[in-house]
Amino acid sequence: MKALHFGAGNIGRGFIGKLLADAGIQLTFADVNQVVLDALNARHSYQVHVVGETEQVDTVSGVNAVSSIGDDVVDLIAQVDLVTTAVGPVVLERIAPAIAKGLVKRKEQGNESPLNIIACENMVRGTTQLKGHVMNALPEDAKAWVEEHVGFVDSAVDRIVPPSASATNDPLEVTVETFSEWIVDKTQFKGALPNIPGMELTDNLMAFVERKLFTLNTGHAITAYLGKLAGHQTIRDAILDEKIRAVVKGAMEESGAVLIKRYGFDADKHAAYIQKILGRFENPYLKDDVERVGRQPLRKLSAGDRLIKPLLGTLEYSLPHKNLIQGIAGAMHFRSEDDPQAQELAALIADKGPQAALAQISGLDANSEVVSEAVTAYKAMQ
């Protein structure tokens, strides 16, 4: 089996690429970073530090790399069995034209073996969004063929991969946590379902997408925002602060109550899942910076994302949400010189005031009780 993976960054190498290579799949990375491409093609291997209770070093071998903006990537799409991505939500649109060209070439070459494309991004139904971009880039006469022969498979991914603080200056070395979860929608595949250790197949993807979004992502973001306000540097430092931990755990329990109501998750198992996530935030090997985790607050405060979506669920089912409100207020305080969204957020609040700004970003009614609660909490943090 041959696979092409877009994105040779830390998540690409440390998570999805590693799982594919470990499964014996012939893997080629596509990226724009020439230093990483050259290193991969010189060595065809790299090291992954897997850290949890203990630390182990795994070697991923037999990999190649191509530029994601050249002809090579188009040729590969015409040949491979699987295309995966870990490029970040905003980059999906940029890689779509190359994928479209590759699919046209595949059609022209008469390659009708099934191809499945899986976007492994921190977003809800990312592959469906990628499909929209690809379809827009396709000529009309190729669209029906692509619908017939190409599966666009949505997935939920979960593994903390902090930026590498490698002492060796090795551009390929990466550190990841022991925990990993890659859940894919088995109803969307073309052809036989793949058997890849570490890839979990489900016919109820949205339950797992929301479980991860409402727990890991919600908890991670709130830890970062409250941690930064309290002057902590890392996620571990922040979650070991008892005041912050209580709010984060409370927020995950509030969002969890929505999941239990909506999808019928077992309450005891979900409580154990929350505990596992708190343990992951405490991992001493992961030097995860609160500023990195908190960045892009406008996206994280949008209606379909990790703070507002669970809040809307609590309103739908008339459930408590005081800790989620604290997290939203913390996000409104997020400031970073390196993050354009943080600067835009600050400007919006300065211009319109917190009430109108939050309503505009989140889609919540400016005159609603929850916006009033969030503004009160926001002002109390000043």
Curated annotation (Swiss-Prot):
GO process annotations (BP): mannitol catabolic process
PROSITE patterns linked to this entry: MANNITOL_DHGENASE
Binding site for NAD(+): 3-14
Any one of the GO CC terms: cytosol
Enzymatic reactions: D-mannitol 1-phosphate + NAD(+) = beta-D-fructose 6-phosphate + NADH + H(+)
Disulfide bonds: none
Annotated GO MF terms: mannitol-1-phosphate 5-dehydrogenase activity
Gene3D superfamilies: N-(1-d-carboxylethyl)-l-norvaline Dehydrogenase, domain 2, NAD(P)-binding Rossmann-like Domain
Residues modified as N6-acetyllysine: 269
Enzyme Commission numbers on file: 1.1.1.17
InterPro entries assigned: 6-PGluconate_DH-like_C_sf, 6PGD_dom2, Mannitol_1_phos_5_DH, Mannitol_DH, Mannitol_DH_C, Mannitol_DH_CS, Mannitol_DH_N, NAD(P)-bd_dom_sf
Domain of life: Bacteria
Sorted UniProt keywords: Acetylation, NAD, Oxidoreductase
EC main group: oxidoreductase
Keyword NAD: yes
Family the UniProt entry places it in: Belongs to the mannitol dehydrogenase family.
PANTHER family named in the record: ALTRONATE OXIDOREDUCTASE-RELATED, MANNITOL-1-PHOSPHATE 5-DEHYDROGENASE
Name listed for the protein in its UniProt record: Mannitol-1-phosphate 5-dehydrogenase
Species in which this protein is naturally found: Shigella flexneri
Protein encoded by which gene: mtlD
